[in-house]
Amino acid sequence: LSLVGSEMCIRDSNISGPRDIKFSVVRYGNVMGSRGSVIPFFINKRDSGAVELPITNMKMTRFNISLEAGVALVMFAIGHHLGGEIFIPKIPSYRIVDVAKAIAPNLPLVEVGIRPGEKLHEEMITVTDAMNTIDLGPYYAILPSVAFNHKYEDYVNHHNAVKVPEGFHYSSDTNTEWETVESMREKIKKYVDPNFEIK
């Protein structure tokens, strides 16, 4: 299911009233090394003899999550959800230029412009979402804006959570945890390619 489709499914489930089946969603962006993501793209460019690396925008940022962390989030959601939550992990951000420097430090970077529909930064919790968001420690959970099965307090008590501050939002450009060039190299070797080398 798409993100929008998943959220509509949850909303419909909540509106239709109590039943045995429960739905929740996980939201975590791109997985490190997944098909079409920037890490294998840069590695392939470098290894095929590119003389430069294309960067859509020098200020672009993204959240960073490994496949293992994504699976852990899914398992957490399965084991802990009341139903209707959207679970979001607390994960570091990276700058696209730092990924390029981690993979091919000697290649120049050329800005080519953002593609249609592409975002400069990744936003996983908007200010509007935050009005229904609680902090679970390692994760956030956006609660249903309309919930017939459980009250807001039920979710807070079930997850032993606290409400996020007013005006909170969770975006890759304002994150407080950041990957460095060196940490990206370590994670590429650990999660993407054990034979990764700097060239």
What residue ranges belong to the model's regions?
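Hydrophobic alpha-helical interface/terminus motif in multipass membrane transporters
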Residues: 10-12, 42
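Active-site-proximal cofactor/substrate-binding loop regions of enzyme domains
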Residues: 6, 15-17
